[in-house]
Amino acid sequence: MSGRLKLAASFSILFLAGPGIACAQQQVIGAPPEAHNMKLVGTSDLQARSAYQPTIHHQGDRWIAYIGHHGGSDEIPAPVNPQTGKAEPNGTSIVDVTDPSQPRYLRHLPGQEGKYEAGGAQMVRICDGKALPTGDRNAVYMLRTFGGEAHEIWNVADPANPVLITRIAGLKDTHKNWWECDTGIAFLVSGAPDWRTRRMTQVYDLSDPAHPQKIRDFGLPGQEPGSTGAVPTELHGPISTGPSGNRVYFGYGTNKGGVLQIVDREKLLNGPREPTADNLRLPEIARLTMSAFNGAHTTFPMLGMPIAEFAKDKDGKTRDIVMIVDEAILNECNEPRQMVWFADITIENRPMMISNYTVPEASGSFCERGGRFGAHSSNESMAQVFYKKMVFISFFNAGVRALDIRDPYHPTEVGYFIPAITAATDKRCVKIDGKDRCKVAIQTNNVETDERGYLYIVDRANTGLHILEMTGPARAVAGLP
């Protein structure tokens, strides 16, 4: 295994030594973006709000981007909305991207007052009412977090005029969730007041969004109320394969002590619900425990992948793969490198790491650029245009990276895009001898794709939304013309 890991890393280094290498250190306003096999299609400044999660939804004959935001900063706790002329706490941006070259900003929906992680409305998921078992067929539902204290559901059938449907309140540290549109089951990342961890899972039936029904609380044994001893690392987020796949992949830890937990969905939903250690263990199939150096921010399943190298083998021609993405937390490399990992879970109770990927720091002097450098998240769309062929990883000051993962044992970078900074790009600071030393750099925070083959990246440092497309030989990896 160690040989494969080293090979994957060294292959990435060799690839990046080719054309288009990013070699500049400090970004300056007016300089062009740095790009290889990607090009800019369109932008929106998102009212200079710190952005977290983009979700792209095909809504009738339109394509709408719903973008969650972090809370405001010390300097600007509530930016002015040019559409209303009022200062509004960061919330949700709603942007029409039907023409990706000319995004139209439709609405800012304010979130919770508060700065950074204490405010905003970071997470967004969308389900059509006609897809949900008992939803209003004319509705389009947006599930979002509200600061750290609640989850909200809005009707965004008219995306410029959202209507609040309901709120699940009385929580803390709400964060990244997953919503199955065909069943209505939602895995809500929350902090329940009596649990021993900052974040765990609350499973809800949101098939009728106007009447949420709680199913159960879930987490790792030792996190539940009344338990003793060391508390296992907190949840970051789940991804479910729904009833057909009958699996939920939970990622615990963000930049340290990561755990991939593979869970039987049916047992999770229908097993005993009291949060005892035995009941929490019951639906678990396996865990993959990572190094103390690395977390599990995103756990993206790619099941039944045909491996060309194994095509003539009697067994194991296809493999079940989960991509695990860590999150860099600290500025200017003041932590272990946060990376991308690929796990083979074909033998579910014996998952194993098979490869990894990182951006070579020397390719852009990224530790000196300012802000965070390292992985954060991947696209989560399972649309066929890219699924099991190419993934996109946000890498903070190294922009977004495109990986050819058709052979997940040897992931290969095939493109990147680092946006140019603007006058809105916020500084990032570190303490040197007790004083702030600040630099301005892109902080590509999250990435998503749509069925048309466009990429959407958003910036944590207030630089807005960039809509991209693949160019050159990288398009062939996805089968794009």
List each model region and its residues.
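N-terminal secretory signal peptides that target proteins for export/translocation
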Residues: 1-5
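Bacterial N-terminal signal peptides
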Residues: 8-20
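Feature marking well-ordered beta-strand scaffolds used for ligand recognition
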Residues: 23-481
